[in-house]
Amino acid sequence: ILKRLSGRGVRFVVDATGDLLKNVLKYKPFLVKPNHHELGDMFGVTTQTDDEIIEYSKKLQVLGAQNVLVSRASKGAMLIDADGKAHKIGNATGKLVNSVGCGDSMVAGFVAGCIEKGDYAYALKLGSACGNATAFSPELATKDEIINIFNTGFNSQKGVSL
């Protein structure tokens, strides 16, 4: 499918790992979203620090990824955007209820933020709010829960550019 769409101006997101992710990078996905363990595993290393995540995310960009969004469990998330700029955001304050769907919610929020504002820092914060709101809910989060976390849950974090 990606081969057929390549070169037609279609932007796509890949939330996959290992060889599957490596094999689609040549089609220049708009966004890939590994977690920090998956990112390290792809290169046979451990990625824990900001510098390590930036280094290996940029390697994914050299291979074709435009934006690399790395979820980091309790440490929040980092984004290396298509301009090569690194951003990070912590998690919102709340109680973990359910981790199922958090990554998918983060991706959806990030894409929505990019479409809405075209601003990577905003998209990272919205994606993180969606992922956190889902984590704090027994099911997928509601729009009101997401808005509340976006506005108050990060203690005024906007996403820090590194």
Residue ranges and their predicted role:
Residues I1-D51:
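Conserved beta-alpha-beta core of the PfkB/ribokinase-like small-molecule kinase fold
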Residues K3-R8, K22-N23, D50-L162:
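Conserved phosphate-binding/catalytic region of the ribokinase-like
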